[in-house]
Regions:
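Alpha/beta-hydrolase-fold enzymes
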Residues: 29, 33, 47, 51-155
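Conserved catalytic-core motifs of eukaryotic protein kinase domains, centered on the activation segment
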Residues: 7-10, 79
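Alpha/beta-hydrolase active-site loop
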Residues: 9-30
Length: 178
């Protein structure tokens, strides 16, 4: 579900219980006692890793494997994204998200465009405006076009606890109350 203002207070635990764990419950109803090969992309991969760790603590063995693409579990070196992760930047972002209850997908896409300015801004601009060429679609443009909104509380907690404080890698992150 793509969140709306009504989902402002949806938490990371909600994403885990209503997303990952509910999906596993549904799968196990169709194919009982079968282990699932989980795949997560970007924040979905991080959520899957958190779910797998929480499940391991509860001796829940429904996951056979976990595969993550473009996902982080250690945020100590977030690369170019660190430009956007500081207490001041997060305060500004929180104020922006608070108004609508979500971070709009175009705002998230804009951050990624700023990280890949040559591929996503300059090269297409030069080709289109200066050379009069039509640029083809590339994988980065497709990925940015397939955006989702981020619920205020979930995204705020994600940025503070994982990016700013690195609570997951340092063993301080609490998932599903444990």
């Amino acid at each position: 579900k793509n969140p709306t203002a009504a989902d402002r207070d949806v938490t990371m635990d909600d994403y885990l219980s209503l997303g990952v764990l509910t999906a596993l419950d549904a799968i196990n109803k169709v194919v009982p006692k079968r282990k699932v090969h989980g795949v997560g992309y970007c924040i979905g991969g991080t959520l899957l890793a958190i779910a797998a760790a929480a499940m391991a603590q509860q001796e829940d063995e429904r996951l056979a494997t976990v595969t993550m693409f473009a996902a982080q579990t250690d945020f100590s070196e977030p690369g170019e994204l660190s430009v956007f992760i500081s207490p001041a930047q997060l305060a500004m972002l929180e104020a922006l998200m608070w108004k609508k209850g979500v971070l709009e997908s175009r705002q998230m896409g804009g951050a990624f465009q700023m990280l890949r300015t040559y591929d996503l801004l300059w090269s297409p601009s030069v080709a289109t405006y200066l050379k009069g060429e039509r640029t083809g679609v590339n994988d980065l443009m497709s990925w940015n076009a397939d955006g989702t909104r981020m619920a205020y509380r979930m995204h705020t907690d994600y940025l503070h606890q994982l990016y700013l404080n690195n609570d997951l890698a340092e063993g301080r992150y609490v998932a599903l109350g444990e």
